[in-house]
Amino acid sequence: MAENEAQKLINFIANAKKITPVKVTYKGTLATEVPDTVQQFGDESFGQLIGDWSEIELLIKNLPSEDVFIENDSRNSAVPLLDKKEINARIEPGAIIRDQVEIGDNAVIMLGAVINIGAEIGANTMIDMGAVLGGRAIVGENSHIGAGAVLAGVIEPASAQPVRIGNNVLVGANAVVIEGVQVGDGAVVAAGAIVTKDVPANTVVAGVPAKVIKEIDSKTQQKTALIDALRGL
């Protein structure tokens, strides 16, 4: 991601209106008229309100607590979650994906994955359970980021380089790739490795810190082959 694109993300977060989104089910007469910025389902005596707490709090201030049920999962949030309805990928329940994330065709995002703003995921790539892609992390096509793996994010400074994972790469479970590291096409990062330096294409790295232990051979290719059927929609 170019420096000017990183700066756009920084500006977006800095200038975004911070909101505390809530969904409130209520019974009784609201204190004031519902503004256009709050969604209302039902009527003035029973229904649901969806919007920012700063506005809804004023509407329900006269209602007893037993007549109000409040659902809330964030406070002063600057970045909404990604609208996933039109994405041509498989995204399982429990994945947390923030806005301004790019997801390629037939990618798979497993439950519990966390993907921060500005991240990019290539076509046919799988992000496994509990994996974390930090801000601006980039993963190429036909790759696999293993369960619990972390690709460190870097939003600031704008000049900092993000993690870049190439095409046809396997990152093993619980591996960590540090900010700015580039992993070349066809490489394999062993489970639990801590990657602090760039990884050449078609090599296997392992250890803490990770070091090249061999080049990719036919045996390694068989062990790390991805299954296309898992990526079909």
Curated annotation (Swiss-Prot):
EC number: 2.3.1.89
Reaction catalysed by this enzyme: (S)-2,3,4,5-tetrahydrodipicolinate + acetyl-CoA + H2O = L-2-acetamido-6-oxoheptanedioate + CoA
Enzyme type, top EC level: transferase
One function term, GO molecular function aspect: tetrahydrodipicolinate N-acetyltransferase activity
Pathway noted in the entry: Amino-acid biosynthesis; L-lysine biosynthesis via DAP pathway; LL-2,6-diaminopimelate from (S)-tetrahydrodipicolinate (acetylase route): step 1/3
Annotated keywords: Acyltransferase, Amino-acid biosynthesis, Diaminopimelate biosynthesis, Lysine biosynthesis, Repeat, Transferase
Entry-linked InterPro entries: DapH, DapH_N, Hexapep, Hexapep_transf_CS, Trans_hexapeptide_repeat, Trimer_LpxA-like_sf
GO biological process: diaminopimelate biosynthetic process; lysine biosynthetic process via diaminopimelate
Keyword tRNA-binding: no
Pfam families: DapH_N, Hexapep, Hexapep_2
Similarity comment: family membership: Belongs to the transferase hexapeptide repeat family. DapH subfamily.
HAMAP family attached to this UniProt entry: DapH
Summary of the function given for this chain in its UniProt record: Catalyzes the transfer of an acetyl group from acetyl-CoA to tetrahydrodipicolinate.
Protein's recorded name: 2,3,4,5-tetrahydropyridine-2,6-dicarboxylate N-acetyltransferase
Organism encoding this protein: Leuconostoc mesenteroides subsp. mesenteroides (strain ATCC 8293 / DSM 20343 / BCRC 11652 / CCM 1803 / JCM 6124 / NCDO 523 / NBRC 100496 / NCIMB 8023 / NCTC 12954 / NRRL B-1118 / 37Y)
Gene name of the record: dapH
